C-alpha cells in the first residue's frame, strides 16, 4: 500500500492576527543548549498536518493522520490523543506568529502515543510492487534482446502467488514459498507484449507478443494528439469555418474509436483515436464550449490526422461558465470539526488495516485502483474468511446520441485508460473528512519509472446513525451508534470524477458506493430555450441545460469483481424468491407469505438482471450457524441511488457494443474462480471485436455447485441530465451491499458475553 501523505491539500489559515500577549522567549533552551526555532504554520503544513487556532481557549489543535494534539503557547506539556506529553521546548509566539523547535514534529508525532501506524514484521504476499521492485522489473525487461527503445509500459504490477498460499499466510502465518513476480505489459508501437519477471531470482520468465488486440491509451498519447492537432493545417481550416482563428486555443480530447464492423470506415489494425475538441475562452471551463460536429481521426503510429469527419456547423457556445467560484461569493459556513482526541480506532500495519473485527489488505492497481484482499471477520476469537479479493472490475460510460461526434462514445475508463493511473489526489476536509488518514501510492508511469501519487487513498471512521434502538415502554432506552470504516479513492477521467467508497460496517456488512461528479459532456446546439424552433430536434437525445448546450443522455455502469469466500472457498449460489401462496392451514386468512428457495447451478443461469424483490445469496453448504442454516452473504447490486440500471444497458441487441460488452446488461454474474479472469470487459477491450470478458468467461457454463466462485456485480445509473448539474455536477451516488445472511448466530454488534465471576 502507500505511505502516509506528507502533504495536506487543506489550506488552513492560522487565525493569529489577534491580540496575543505572548512575548518572544529568546533565547529558548532545550537540554541545556539553545533550541533552533522554526515557524509552526509552514513547518507543520509541509509535514501534512492541519493547524487550527482556538482564540477563545488560546490553544492550537494539530491533526495529522492518527495524532490529535492540543498545545498552548508557553505550556511545557502537550496533550496527544488524550495523554500528556512533556515538551522539550514550548510553543512560543513572536509578532503574532507561532514558533516551534525543529524537534517538535519528532517529539510530538513520533512520541508513541499515536498507534495508528504499526511496523510490518511480515510483508504481505499481496503487497503492491515497491518503487525498487518496479525499477528491477524494468531493468530485467530492458535487458532482453527483444526489447526495443521506443517500447512503452502499460502496466507493471504484482503477479500474485497462489490463492491457497496467500490464505495460509493470512490465517496461519505460513510463509509463501513462491518468488515475488512482476507482470509487465508493454506497447511496442501498436503491438502488445506481456512479460513475467522473477524478482527473487532476477530473471525474465516469459516474453509473449499478443495478437489481434489493442492496448491502452497512455498519458503521452494525449500530448501527441494535441501536438498533431496544433500542427495540422487541415484541422486549422476546419475550425476556421467555425469562427476560430487561433487553433492553439483548441483543447483536444482523444477518445477510443470503438468497433462497428468496418461501418465507420476505419482500419481495424491501426492504432487510432478520435479527437473531439473544445475552445478555451479563458473561463477555466473549456467543457462548456464544445466545437460540435467536428471529429479528427488520428493515427498514433503515423503521427498524423488520417481523416476529418464533419457535420453542419454549429456555433460554439461562448458564454463563460466557470465552475471554480471565481465569479461567486462563497457562503459563510461555521467550522465543523471532526475530532478523535484519543486517536484512531484502527491500525495500519504495512498494508494491512485492522478495525474492530475486520482485517483486510489494501493495495493500489494502475488499472482498477484499490484492491481489497484477504478480508476476514473476527467472530468471538475466530477469524472467518469473507472475501479473498475485491476491486472495481471495470466500467463503461456509453452515450445514446447517434450523431457524428457522439455515436462512438462508450468510455471503458479503466480498461482503455487506466483509472489507477488517473487517480486524483484527495483534498483533506473536502474530498474526505479532516480526520482521514491519507495514503500515498506508487505505480509505474508509461516509461517504467516509479511514480508516487500523493494522497491517493483516504481511510477514515465515521458516525453512521443508530446501529440499533428499542424503547420499551417504561424502560430505559436501548440504542447504540453505528460506526463505519471507509476506504475512499477518486479517479478523474476527462470530464468526470469518480469516487469509490469501500465501507465496512461493524455488523459484517460491506458496502460499495460509486459517486459520479465533475463536468457533464455536453453538446453544442442552436436552441437557447425550449421555445426555440430547433429545440425539439436539439433535445432528441438529451436535455437543454443551458443556452445552446445539451447534456446528452448516457449511462454510468460499474462492475465490481468480488472473489467472495464465505467461511471458505467452496460456495454455492442460492436464490430466495418471496411469493404469495394460498393459505391451506385454515383460519380467516386466504393467503400466506412464503419463500421459494433453490440453487442456481451454472454460470449462464447465474447471469441475471437484478430484481430487488428477490434475494440472492452466496452460501457455504459446508458450514452452518448454530440454528443449522448455511452461512451466507447476500448480494445486492442496487441498494439506492439515482436512476438505477436494473433493466440493463440502453441499447438494442443488434448493437456491436452490446455484443462486445455483455457485462453491461445484467447486474449479477457468478463464474468459477480462474485467476486469469479479472476484467468484465476483457483484458484488452480497446477496439475488441467480440466479448472477451464475462461473456467469454461464462461461455463454458461451468458448475457453481459447492465450488470456488467469483461474484461480478454490475450497478450504475442512467444519466438523464438536468440544469442543477451544470456547470458542475453534485455527486450522484449509487450504493451496493454485501450483507451477512445467517453468517452469525446473533446480532453481531451486541459485543462479547460477560465472563462469569
Curated annotation (Swiss-Prot):
The active site is at 413 (proton acceptor), 496 (schiff-base intermediate with substrate). Ca(2+) 2 binds at residues 603, 697, 700, 702, 709. Cu cation binds at residues 554, 556, 719. InterPro entries: Cu_Am_Ox_Cu-bd (IPR049947), Cu_Am_ox_TPQ-bd (IPR049948), Cu_amine_oxidase (IPR000269), Cu_amine_oxidase-like_N (IPR012854), Cu_amine_oxidase_C (IPR015798), Cu_amine_oxidase_C_sf (IPR036460), Cu_amine_oxidase_N-reg (IPR016182), Cu_amine_oxidase_N2 (IPR015800). Residues 1-30 form the signal peptide. The keyword rRNA-binding does not apply. It is found in: Periplasm. It comes from the Bacteria. GO terms for cellular component: periplasmic space. Pathway: Amino-acid degradation; L-phenylalanine degradation; phenylacetate from L-phenylalanine: step 2/3. It catalyses: a primary methyl amine + O2 + H2O = an aldehyde + H2O2 + NH4(+); 2-phenylethylamine + O2 + H2O = 2-phenylacetaldehyde + H2O2 + NH4(+). The keyword Signal applies. Its EC number is 1.4.3.21. Transmembrane segments: none annotated. Ca(2+) 1 binds at residues 563-565, 708-709. The enzyme prefers aromatic over aliphatic amines. Homodimer. Belongs to the copper/topaquinone oxidase family. PANTHER family: AMINE OXIDASE, COPPER AMINE OXIDASE. This is Primary amine oxidase. It comes from Escherichia coli (strain K12). The lineage of its organism: Bacteria, Pseudomonadati, Pseudomonadota, Gammaproteobacteria, Enterobacterales. The gene is tynA.
